[in-house]
From Swiss-Prot:
It comes from Vibrio parahaemolyticus serotype O3:K6 (strain RIMD 2210633). This is Cell division protein ZapD. GO terms for cellular component: cell division site; cytoplasm. It is found in: Cytoplasm. Belongs to the ZapD family. Keywords: Cell cycle, Cell division, Cytoplasm, Septation. InterPro entries: ZapD (IPR009777), ZapD_C (IPR027462), ZapD_sf (IPR036268).
Amino acid sequence: MTTHKFEHPLNEKTRIYLRVESLLRQAHLASGFADNHQYQLFFRALFDMVEIFEQIQLKSELAKDLEKQRLSYRHWLNVEGVDQEALNSLLNEIDVVHSQLMGAERFGQALKEDRFLSSIRQRFNLPGGSCCFDLPALHYWLHLPIERKKHDANQWQKSLKPLSDALTLWLKLARETGHFKAQIARAGFFQSDADEANILRLHIPMKYGVYPMISGHKNRFAIKFMAFENGQACSQDVEFELAVCS
């Protein structure tokens, strides 16, 4: 059965984490510059991340969240039936990633200080502003050998590696706390309680032709399914799978 997967954050911090994860993925996928237009996606992702970093102290928040996960997993040390080797390996991974995160400079600082990036960032935000007459420096860079462009892209992304590693680990562990269970949204509506949850994950069969509209917070949430073809609230029962992740 064909399904579409959907995630929804239940607090603002997790919302930002998911946005940054998406931007990191976009930058990585576009950095191969397989066609002449991927550079727009690449630079847009970089500049969007810089804007987020300017507004939020993401480094300190992520460090605190990793520490919470570490303390949570330490409670399982010496507990009978728990794979202690795997647990110690995970705790070591958290320690290494946390240490690298704390030793890193402010997120996005290297990107802001890069002469080329800073020269194109402002005009890149203009509608259609990536034309050669608006950004001659970018136009020149685009005509450099592909090896040079890939090298530059890798260096810019390398400055974000401590962030990427920490965010990837935190989201991986958060997602693994939830287990998918079959649910039914009666007349297209479902609501439930949550216990300090961060993320909802849904698997929705495409046959229903619906998408979810979700509201709520870490302790309670509601899901209303909308029909894609007309944008109206769905009136049929919808069977789907749901994982509540903390």
